[in-house]
Each structure stands twice: as C-alpha cells, then as structure tokens.
Amino acid sequence: MTTLTSPHDLLAAIPFLIGYHPIDSLVLVSIKEDCVGMAMRIDYPIDQGEVAFDLCASHISADEAEGALIVAYQPHGRSDGYEVLAQTTAALSRAGIAIYESILIADGFYRSVLCHDITCCPVGGRPIPPLDSTQIAAESVVAGHPMPFASFADLGASVRSNLLAHEEQWLERVQKSCVDPLDSDLNNLQRDGATAVIDLANDFIAHGISTDQDLIAHVLGRLSEIQVRDFALGSHDLDSADGYRRMWMHLLRSAPPGFVAPVACLAAAIAYEYGDGALARAALDRAFTDAPTYSLALLLQRVFSAGWPPQSFAQMRSELHPKVCAAIFG
C-alpha cells in the first residue's frame, strides 16, 4: 500500500495502517514523495490546547513528511470534530507540513472538509463502506497482510498468554533451557540458542506454524540470554519477515511468566519495523508487565515514543547483527 487517491482509499487504509478499526480517535498519516509513510493514532483530544496538537505534528515532522492526511473519529455525543481537524491542521501548518486530506467521521458517516462539492461530499456525509468491499482490502490480503482487528481490545487479546503458558510442566520445560550468564560453557550455549532460533524460524517460514513443542520451549529458554536475544532480533530479512512475525507472536502467547519480556520485545520490534505500531505497543506492554526494568523494552519504548522512523530502526538492527554473529560464532 503506497498511494491513496481518494477519501474512500484513506478510510479503507487506516485500519490496515494501525492494525485495527479505530473509534474515538485522531489519526494522522504522513506522506513522503506521494507515498504513505507513518500512521499515528491518539485518543480523541479532550484538551484542545496547542501543545497537544503540536506534539502530534512533531512526530509527523520527524518522519520527514511533506504532507499529511488527517481523520477525526468523533465520539458519539460530541460535536467538535471540525474544531479538532482545524486545530490539527493549524499545528501541521506551523510545522511546515501540507494538508492533503482532512476527514471527519461521525455516527457512521464521513465527509472531507477539503471538498466543497456537495454532490461529492454532502453536508451530512456519506456512509462508510464496509472494509471488505474495498480494493485496498483486497490488495492487502493478496499481499499477505492480515485483516485488521475489529477493535483495540481484540488487538490486545492477540498478544495475551494462552493456556499452555500457565502450565507448570511447560514452565519446567522452558526453564531447562534457561541460560546462566556465569556458565563456564556460555559461548556454546549461545551458539546452541542462535541455531535453535534459525531452526524454529525455518519451520514457521516453511509451514506457517511449528508443532515442535520441545524446540519452542528450548528457544523460549535460550532467549533469556542477551546475545541469543540480540541474534534473534537481527535474524530476519525482507523475505523471511512474515515467518518471523508469526513465530514471535506464537512464542509470545506461549511464553510462561518470567520468560515473556525477551520474546515480547522481539514481537514488538518486528511489528514496529513493518509499520504495525499498535501491535508493537501492545507487545511491549506485555514485556513491561513481565519485567518492568527490562533494558530492551526501555530502549524500544524510547524509540516508539520518539517516533523514530521504522527504516532507521531496521538499519540499526542490520548494523548490529554482524557484530552479534561474530561474538557468538567467532
């Protein structure tokens, strides 16, 4: 999904860009060289002071955007959507960012405030078309992208632990592969862990899933070692990314308490890198619940909050990976 040519396209694209169907929200999409860049969503503004809107504009500016698309999902019972759009437009203009589209959504109808043709955008708006009837949805599914979650709650449910994660016997299996950082054979354990990550990833890439529970438990345990985790962070490329995303999400749901943070960070990082910011934050929340001071989670939190471009994060990861490989394999 690189270009959006109409309000209809924009409405269809937003759930794919943020991972779920937003409500009571303000969504901004950055545009660079006529292509979609970053999408960000915030709760529908209650405080309409300049500072809050300028902060949103600063994130779009940090993405080196030339222009932006704005959509306000006005909550039921509110009537200030046009004012929210005007405030957002003013903040973006102060940041030197052009406004390519500005849409108000209220009570199941949408209207572009930039369109003054009432035959195109009547005052009462037009009904929002079903997502699954749009070309954007069809193209996204053909490209291998999953349909967006119905709500933020459904997205959160996708990263919750499953029943296996709470079984005592499963915890014992994972613990057997946990790495003691003072182990005299640490380097061999690191090599074993890195190799296990690749073996499991190949299973997910080839079959979409792995039924090798021993290998899954082994990888979850080995990820407790920082070098193994960092090796895993850099192991995917463009061709293998979908398999790795499926793997980290599967392992995140299966990770027992005390082993969640490493794989949650891996799931968050790859989601962020491929533009799924909402899923990235949901996974990161699980990391903090498991280990509030986990260093990689703190780093990712700073990256996400700063609105660091995903491509910059990917570059950092690719530059780090050869160094990690050299440390593990020599």
Locate each region found by the language model.
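Short beta-strand scaffold segments in enzyme catalytic cores
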Residues: 26-30
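Short acidic-glycine loop/turn motifs at beta-strand connectors
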Residues: 31-35
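Charged, compositionally biased boundary regions
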Residues: 1-17, 21-24, 37-330
